[in-house]
């Protein structure tokens, strides 16, 4: 009789565990769906705040609101689903506990009256012990909810840690002395999508001190090529070398000290104007800052600001126009006077007068051994360079001196008109 009574809680313990694991998968999946919905809501909110003017001007507010409502309903449905499965698991667990208790009492009473193989005290002890065995099982549903959310958090963290980083796979990046800064690229390919390459260049050589312009149609990969030369993007195929050393092997700090990169889209950071001008640079004096401001014309804006270099810039730099932000970024790029200057559409947001001033300043500022690579669509920018590379979706179409390339382009245009 005692063996039978002892077997009852074991059987119901196994049944409770089976039910718990059945609902575990459902709770885990619902928790993942809930977290994904929350992430999407957060992403939509940030995107809306950053583009509120575009949304207003295009009348897309209703669409954004509908998307928000849909994501909110999805998140609510996921939370309801989690609660439903959690409650179901709780109900089954409590049900098994009650059945177990009733079964032990009933079979125990029958055993006492019929065979007397156990005493009343033993029956009471068995019911107490069985309750203590099954009581922790009732906590399983809440544990499964936490388990599902924890697994998703760990999965997200793992995906972040698995993202490629600077010097991927290199334990000790190199910090060699670069007596020259010749740039070479061989068989490089890069694609933002797996099935489509944004750029495909078989061979490219830029020697120290060359002044090079990269031309091409929209979407042919000019900006992407510049980012790979800056060491910001790793080619999906091929290699980019600096002085004969693969950039992936060179310490990021050394690249930052050697290469100055001005992106096409200018971003300012929250802080003072001074902070933005010397962002990431060490040991820059006020004299260097003022000199660079005079060269770019930023000194005019600086003198109009009541706090000068201590002017607070809000997040995103929205208090400045596009042209002003571009001048600030260009000033930042030339302050360090680095050996390689990479400019992506450096005058795109400037008026004609400011553009002429900037081009003239750069022509006088660039020293003989300083390498310049500029991406542009504007003919005036070509006055700074002595070599032009024309890029297409298939790779480099034309590469030569400025006079040779411009003559070929002119000839091709005349043939096309004819």
Which residue ranges define each predicted feature?
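Hydrophobic alpha-helical segments in the permease module
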Residues: 13-15, 86-100, 120-142
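ABC ATPase nucleotide-binding domain helical subdomain, centered on the C-loop/LSGGQ "ABC signature"
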Residues: 159, 241, 249, 256, ...
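A short, proline-enriched helix->beta-strand linker immediately N-terminal to the Walker B motif
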Residues: 335-339
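Cytosolic ends of transmembrane helices, especially the final helix of ABC transmembrane type-1 domains
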Residues: 37, 41, 57-60, 84, ...
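Catalytic Walker B motif of ABC-type/P-loop ATPase nucleotide-binding domains
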Residues: 341-345
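Transmembrane helices of ABC transporter permease
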Residues: 1-33, 106-118, 135
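Loop segments that connect adjacent transmembrane helices in multi-pass transporters
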Residues: 33-81
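Helix-to-loop junction immediately C-terminal to a conserved catalytic motif
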Residues: 230
